[in-house]
Amino acid sequence: MIAKGGRGFVGLGVLATIAALPFEKYAAVGLGAFTVFLAIMFRDPKRTIGKGIVAPADGTIREVDPSKGLVSTYLALRNVHVTRAPIPGVVEKAEIIKGRHAPAFARTSTKNQRFEILVRTEIGQVRAVEMVGAIARRIVPYIEEGQSLAKGEKLSLIRFGSRVDLFLPVGSVRIMVKKGQKVRAGLTQIAEVPDGGLE
């Protein structure tokens, strides 16, 4: 399945490949390969939702800071780029903020274009910041303010590689992932509530 916001790119790739085929086979092969790349990039696989607080994005954990409740995930080009709600709640803020396009792993990336999400949950306010990178140019939101979210529900599509910073309520959760760990959105448990909630 292709994610909403990526279908047009894949469709154009298919049409361009077909159009080029009668005239330039090498170009058609190149366009076909690029279309396959786009289909992989914008894939939206079904997920079994995991226990506890789950990862908001596919990728690699780049930073963990329990003192801030921070879990930061870097998305490479090969990763699924559909983000998901790590915890159920109500959306209090869902805003695209314009900014730069520095590499997503750079310190200056905090000033990049981003999608800021605040969710009111039973354990307190959870904040997610989805940032575009040097290649990622746009975030396609799937949610709006006032909306109730189920755990694992789709939040957005980030077009190409990027980063997601998740801020959990300090003292309310125990972070369970480490820097360098691979995670999958909606599936990998990244934190737990000490009293055993959010199963």
List the model feature ranges, each with a label.
Residues 1-199:
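Contiguous, well-folded functional domains in the mature portion of proteins
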